[in-house]
């Protein structure tokens, strides 16, 4: 079975071109309330968009490789460990697959924002200061975490190909929520589904928006598990530490490099583990006495 994402690519490109064309008059820089320059709403920056599209093209190949690797494990789990095998011809099997993938995506996505090693695979998607359809294509190249997260699905008896198909459908749905061109939708839809308004919050680096709205298709997971945040104002997009590069290799690997640097700088095993498995931005709680004394002197 061919990946549904491949069939969706022409639609992705068409929507991207239409949005980019509409944004040509909006590429001037506006001044935010903080006095700092920021991209205008709905704007595109050519170098930023080229980087996003390039990462998306590479991710097609890397994702195919990860799926091929996962297929071996999923097939073995489905054939030898699953207590039963669900029929792909039953409608409820598709419901289980799509909802199951979405719930596990929420779980993985939340972990990816709270565990630095996994954040390193995901941060590239958040590295753009623009929020548009090109940003949707700024995908990671390391899907190992998702593959491990979805192991329960073939163990439940879902055919491996159906798991992959549901994964692709989840990804396709998420494309259209990466836009500032769509305001809020009807209340019932906003209550149940992930929407552009919800996902703008997720990409915001403002303190009130950090680590919120992890849902892929359904936003009800965020409402149930306490991570929902409504859109109160236009977010500032990007990472809390600005990334001054459009090099796609550096965008994908920068956090891994930072982890290695912090690991080497730490002198205690506890601190090293914190730098790897703690949340992004984690720092040791204890301060060297000499540094503390120096801080005390300078504070005077």
From Swiss-Prot:
InterPro entries: Fatty_acid_hydroxylase (IPR006694), Sterol_desaturase/TMEM195 (IPR051689). Residues 94-227 form the Fatty acid hydroxylase domain. GO terms for molecular function: glyceryl-ether monooxygenase activity; iron ion binding. The chain crosses the membrane at residues 3-23, 68-88, 91-111, 147-167. Its main location: membrane. It is an enzyme of class 1 (oxidoreductase). Pfam families: FA_hydroxylase (PF04116). It is a multi-pass membrane protein. Its EC number is 1.3.-.-. It is found in: Cell membrane. GO terms for biological process: membrane lipid metabolic process; sterol biosynthetic process. Keywords: Cell membrane, Lipid biosynthesis, Lipid metabolism, Membrane, Oxidoreductase, Steroid biosynthesis, Steroid metabolism, Sterol biosynthesis, Sterol metabolism, Transmembrane, Transmembrane helix. GO terms for cellular component: plasma membrane. PANTHER family: ALKYLGLYCEROL MONOOXYGENASE, STEROL DESATURASE-RELATED PROTEIN. Belongs to the sterol desaturase family. This is C-5 sterol desaturase. It comes from Mycobacterium bovis (strain ATCC BAA-935 / AF2122/97). The gene is erg3.
